[in-house]
Structure formats: C-alpha cells, structure tokens
Amino acid sequence: MLICKVLKPLVSTNRIPGFEHKHLQVVLDGSSNKVAVDAVGCKPGDWVICVGSSAAREAAGSKSYPSDLTIVGIIDHWDPDSPKQIEV
C-alpha cells in the first residue's frame, strides 16, 4: 500500500471498452505523479491509501480490470512532515 496526495482529476473520454467510466485522479507518490482509479470519491488535496498490482484491479471492480493503482481509502488525518515515531 502507498500513501499518496490527490493532485487533480484526470479526464479521459476515449477509453478501451474494459476501462468503463471509473473516475481517475492524478496522485503524487513521493516525487512522481501517477494516475489512479478512484474507487472512493476523493477530491484534490486529500491524502489517500492506494494499492497496486492485482489488489488494484480487484479494488477497481474485477481481476481483469486494467489498473495498476487504485485509491481504496481517504486518510482522515495525516501529517507528512511529522517525525517518524520511534518505539521505545
């Protein structure tokens, strides 16, 4: 799983038949932009949990769905600048 920030929606009206009409979002994963299928209805600025590989296809609706990154959750609170917690 990845923690990503949603940057903006991506509109693609000309798609292959199996791609259906699922919403797409541009997300920031570290320093790179990626396209993710939005399975939860997030908006720009949200921090989200994304899954990849076969989990992404299944989360998008089917193991045959052509996705390698799907948003599966919106994070309620995330401070990316907070220091890592150290277990004592």
Curated annotation (Swiss-Prot):
Which keywords, in A-to-Z order, does the entry hold? Bacterial microcompartment, Carbon dioxide fixation, Carboxysome, Photosynthesis
**PROSITE patterns the UniProt entry points to:** BMV
Task: Tell me where in this chain the BMV domain is found.
Answer: 1-76
The family database entries (InterPro entries) matched by this protein are listed as:
CsoS4A (IPR014076), EutN_CcmL (IPR004992), EutN_CcmL_sf (IPR036677)
Task: Check the record and name the Gene3D superfamilies matching this protein.
Answer: EutN/Ccml
What's in the GO CC field? carboxysome
Q: Where in the cell is it found?
A: Carboxysome
- What Pfam families is this protein classified in? EutN_CcmL
Q: Which cysteines are joined by disulfide bonds?
A: none
SUPFAM superfamilies the UniProt entry points to: EutN/CcmL-like
Biological process according to GO: carbon fixation; photosynthesis
Asked whether the keyword Hydrolase is assigned, the reply is no
How it assembles, according to the record, is: Homopentamer.
- What does the domain comment read? The tight homopentamer forms a pore with an opening of about 3.5 Angstroms in diameter which is positively charged.
> What family, per the record?
Belongs to the CcmL/EutN family. CsoS4 subfamily.
Question: What function does the entry list?
Answer: Probably forms vertices in the carboxysome, a polyhedral inclusion where RuBisCO (ribulose bisphosphate carboxylase, cbbL-cbbS) is sequestered. Has been modeled to induce curvature upon insertion into an otherwise flat hexagonal layer of major carboxysome subunits. Has not been identified in purified carboxysomes; it is expected to be present in very low amounts.
Q: What is the name of the protein in this document?
A: Carboxysome shell vertex protein CsoS4A
Q: Which organism is it from?
A: Prochlorococcus marinus subsp. pastoris (strain CCMP1986 / NIES-2087 / MED4)
Q: Taxonomically, what lineage is the organism? A: Bacteria, Bacillati, Cyanobacteriota, Cyanophyceae, Synechococcales
